[in-house]
Amino acid sequence: MASPEFSFLVPIDFSSASQKALREAHKLAVRMGASLTLLHVRPMSDVRAAIAEGREDLLKGPSRSIAAAMKSHYAERLASLAERFGAAETRLASGRASREIVRAAKGFDLVVMGRTGRGGLSGFLGGTTQKVLATCPVPVAVVPV
């Protein structure tokens, strides 16, 4: 089987906006014969992430155990989405979301991401989306909510 001609990167933060972007990226990928890669960036501490995810059970151990548990948790969630949408690859990163998305975008043909903002230009697009648009080396498709 020939490898896909195009490849799309879809940043996922598990919000409804990012999942809508994934659905749209999937439709486009099917039409174009492109591959999908899902990326999740953990921007906050693992302790805060565990609490935000309602997974306080993961906090019973040293911080390395918490980090490993959260990484595993997000990897499982990404794998589930990848299976559902036929993504070829999943990636996990830690750091500032916009910076990690731009770094990961190199080598892809398109980044497809959601828009969750509320007011003003950065609010309209969302701060992360605006930063990615301003600095990304490849085209970015922004899917409105």
Predicted features, each with a name:
Residues 42, 73, 92-96:
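Short beta->alpha linker loops
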Residues 40, 114-116, 144-145:
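Short secondary-structure boundary segments
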